[in-house]
């Protein structure tokens, strides 16, 4: 087994995910093992557009966006499991379902969220994953996430 780290910077992430500002929520992949796991980060700053209304006096990252970022991490793992090549145009992984989502603490400006996702199974283009979001080593959110591979007409 190799000790080589598999990483992705933002330029590489943009080749795999269709999301763009303000909805691209993964900044970097620190490590991944295709078919097994992926570790990504999101740096949360006061400049995030959602903080204007959630909440101006006490800014808190919306939980649904933490889950969306986790789903983006699962999409990256799914793509890297499918092939090491950049996916062809029109191939996407859609957020297909969520189970057992739990929120344990708020995420605030200045936090760095670590997303650790593990592939549980994949069958016929449907992937099932378990993910945790952590800040300073403390779990802030956990969930089981499903994503579905689809080809869209362009």
From Swiss-Prot:
Lyase keyword on record: yes
Location of the protein in the cell: Cytoplasm
Active site: residue positions: 54
Catalytic activity from the UniProt record: a (3R)-hydroxyacyl-[ACP] = a (2E)-enoyl-[ACP] + H2O
InterPro entries the record matches: FabA_FabZ, FabZ, HotDog_dom_sf
GO molecular function terms attached to this record: (3R)-hydroxyacyl-[acyl-carrier-protein] dehydratase activity
Keyword annotations from UniProtKB, A to Z: Cytoplasm, Lipid A biosynthesis, Lipid biosynthesis, Lipid metabolism, Lyase
Protein name per its UniProtKB record: 3-hydroxyacyl-[acyl-carrier-protein] dehydratase FabZ
């Amino acid at each position: 087994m190799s000790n080589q780290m598999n990483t992705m910077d933002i330029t590489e992430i943009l080749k795999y995910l269709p999301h763009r500002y303000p909805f691209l929520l993964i900044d970097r992949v620190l490590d991944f093992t295709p078919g097994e796991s992926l570790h990504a980060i999101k740096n949360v700053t006061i400049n995030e557009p959602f903080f204007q209304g959630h909440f101006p006096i006490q800014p808190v990252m919306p939980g649904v966006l933490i889950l969306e970022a986790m789903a983006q991490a699962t999409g990256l793992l799914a793509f890297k499991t499918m092939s090491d090549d950049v996916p062809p145009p029109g191939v996407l992984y859609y957020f297909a379902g969520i189970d057992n989502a739990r929120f344990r603490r708020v995420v605030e400006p200045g936090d760095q969220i670590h997303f650790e996702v593990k592939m549980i199974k994949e069958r016929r283009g449907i992937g099932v994953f378990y993910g945790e979001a952590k800040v300073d080593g403390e779990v802030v959110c956990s969930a089981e996430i499903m994503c579905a591979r689809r080809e869209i007409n362009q």
